[in-house]
């Protein structure tokens, strides 16, 4: 299983989930070069190349699942359309499928930079100002990411992410095994209709009353079991909070 993380955190943010999957699956949790000390973000294609090179060196021949959270959806979608590895399933948790103009993204960058850096400077104290929760269990991932973040790397990432252009094509076959999940009260829910129109053969579960990435943050074991169920049975499990 390959996981693409959200904005402002490191790949380790998927470790609470991976702990419940590691006995069954080889879990790969790369951190974007944006949040790596001394590394230079070049482009989405370069990020994908680095991931592909690692998978090749490890002898990975197929992926049971590609998982992506928030803005990780942007990189995951690029990976899915570029990789030559067979991908059996994909799951997007609150995917930030925003299509934002170049000028707006340029304006956003300094605000995002100071928001993420403030998490490092305040040791996570400002988390509640930018996220619906400030659980201690997730603060360290934001602090570690903020420590290594440079303005130049963030600017480069935002320059080729969330672009105002059509979503990349996914084969109908992969769409049939792809799950685009949103919480009913999260801000990213507004992207759902556009994604449904772009990928009509996908699955679109709604977690009623849930906020952005709430299930994986508050119940990583349940989230992990859900992913395993999808891989092993090719369908969502019966969860009491899924909108009927």
Segments (PLM) and residue ranges:
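Gly/Ala-rich beta-loop-alpha elbow adjacent to hydrolase catalytic centers
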Residues: 67-76
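Conserved alpha/beta-hydrolase catalytic His-Asp/Glu region
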Residues: 102-103, 119-172
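Active-site loop/oxyanion-hole signature of alpha/beta-hydrolase fold enzymes
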Residues: 28-65
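Conserved HGGG/HGGXW glycine-rich cap/lid loop of the alpha/beta-hydrolase fold
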Residues: 1-37
